[in-house]
């Protein structure tokens, strides 16, 4: 007897998604009458046709990237169109969703020649502004401060950057959820008990932001790299010259795969086209006190002064 798997349709990352795996975070339905862009399938190990050469890390073939989360699942991302999930003995759907919506989507976007930046993006006065930075820099916390000031989130974690017909960089919305550490929740006066902790991260939580989510593509207005400073100082400076390329390369989601995928030249050209249209800034935050609202004010002032359109 053949079992028929239930399928779910969603719209996220600028893509119509058909999935055999429920992804409740993606509560935006697929666009009616549009073609399905990507398919997420589950397969048992015997029928998956997956070859994993590297015990740790990624196995990269011409049109396929494979990796394993130990004892949980095998993942195969193929041709920018398909994600295969193979459950293993300790399969956990919550943990697997983190990888599907993170690493798998980041790789799939690169296979489609769409730049995935690692950070958060917010909508301000009809433009998208990305906040990129290393892990722990405070990207989601700064984005949350923007939300609390009445602005809307476009993406958190994986930021898809595409181009319009007029070659203007555009940010595609991901899905209405943030990930915040308990320390940030406390600083914002939010009760951690009201939110779901992320798998294996007991002090990091999933924060739904459906009412503060911008669900349409929006032109990119600027890029802000968030870094930790020394002491209480906060500041912002405009990035000049080749440093903009360094920022885009360093903060590409799973950028370590660019070489194996043969995409270094593509990435350079793509970055050139972005930097030709928008300015990049570095924002320094305090490490001794909670300053996201100060940073929001400085960033908004930079926008109003016209420095992003010079």
Locate each region found by the language model.
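Glycine-rich, often acidic-flanked micro-motifs
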Residues: 2-22, 26-28, 125, 129-132, ...
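Long, basic/Gly/Ser/Thr-rich N-terminal segments
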Residues: 1-92, 96, 297-310
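Conserved lysine of the Walker
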Residues: 139
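Aromatic pocket-lining residues of Rossmann-like dinucleotide-binding sites
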Residues: 146
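Phosphate-binding P-loop
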Residues: 112-126
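N-terminal pre-Walker A segment at the start of P-loop NTPase domains
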Residues: 97-115
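Post-Walker A alpha-helix
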Residues: 142-143
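Walker A (P-loop) phosphate-binding loop of P-loop NTPases
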Residues: 136
